Amino acid sequence: MAKLHDKYKETVIAELSKKFGYTSVMQVPRIEKITLNMGVGEAVADKKVMEHALRDMTAIAGQKPVVTVARKSVAGFKIRDGYPIGCKVTLRGERMWEFLERLVDIAIPRIRDFRGLSAKSFDGRGNYAMGVREQIIFPEIDYDKIDKIRGMDIVITTTAKNDEEGRALLDAFNFPFKK
C-alpha cells in the first residue's frame, strides 16, 4: 500500500475532521481519481507522434491510455471528425496513490524554475488542475528515448465540497502551494 494512502487513513482523516468539524468519516474529503490528459495536435500530420505520446503516457501512469478523437471537423486546425488528437488516463485506487506519491515527492521538485503550485487552480468544487510543460520531470521517462518535449494536464478530483476543503486535503499531502 502506498505511503500517502496510509497517511490519509492514519492522520489526514483525523486532522480534517477536527478542522472542519465532521461527525462522520464519510464526510471527510478524499481523492476520487487523478486524470492525466495529453493533447497531441501534431498527430494529425504524423501518426508516429501519437505512438510516442502513448508510450510516454503508459510509462508515467502505469496503465494504457485511451486515445481521444476529434468530435467535429475544424478546417482551421486541419482536423476531421474522428482524427486522434490526444490521449488520457484515469487513475483510481492503488495506482492513483502511487502516482500521487511520485508526483509530490519526485516530479514536482524536478520542474524547472518551480516556485510553488498556484492555489487559483481549484475549480470551486474542491478539484485541482495543474499543467506540466515537460514529461521528462517523471523518473519513468528516459531522456534519450523521447522524440519531443510534451506537456500534459493533471486533474485531481476530490469529494471536497469547496476549494477550502480541497486545499486542506492536498496541503495534508504536502502539496507545495505558493504562500
Swiss-Prot record:
UniProt-listed PROSITE patterns: RIBOSOMAL_L5
GO cellular component: ribonucleoprotein complex; ribosome
Record carries keyword Ubl conjugation: no
Pfam family, one: Ribosomal_L5_C
InterPro entries on file: Ribosomal_uL5 (IPR002132), Ribosomal_uL5_bac-type (IPR020930), Ribosomal_uL5_C (IPR031309), Ribosomal_uL5_CS (IPR020929), Ribosomal_uL5_dom_sf (IPR022803), Ribosomal_uL5_N (IPR031310)
Disulfide bonds: none
UniProt-recorded Gene Ontology molecular function terms: rRNA binding; structural constituent of ribosome; tRNA binding
Keyword terms of this UniProt record: Ribonucleoprotein, Ribosomal protein, RNA-binding, rRNA-binding, tRNA-binding
Quaternary data: Part of the 50S ribosomal subunit; part of the 5S rRNA/L5/L18/L25 subcomplex. Contacts the 5S rRNA and the P site tRNA. Forms a bridge to the 30S subunit in the 70S ribosome.
Family classification: Belongs to the universal ribosomal protein uL5 family.
HAMAP family attached to this UniProt entry: Ribosomal_uL5_B
Function as written in the Swiss-Prot or TrEMBL entry: This is one of the proteins that bind and probably mediate the attachment of the 5S RNA into the large ribosomal subunit, where it forms part of the central protuberance. In the 70S ribosome it contacts protein S13 of the 30S subunit (bridge B1b), connecting the 2 subunits; this bridge is implicated in subunit movement. Contacts the P site tRNA; the 5S rRNA and some of its associated proteins might help stabilize positioning of ribosome-bound tRNAs.
PANTHER family: 60S RIBOSOMAL PROTEIN L11-RELATED (PTHR11994)
Annotated protein name in UniProt: Large ribosomal subunit protein uL5
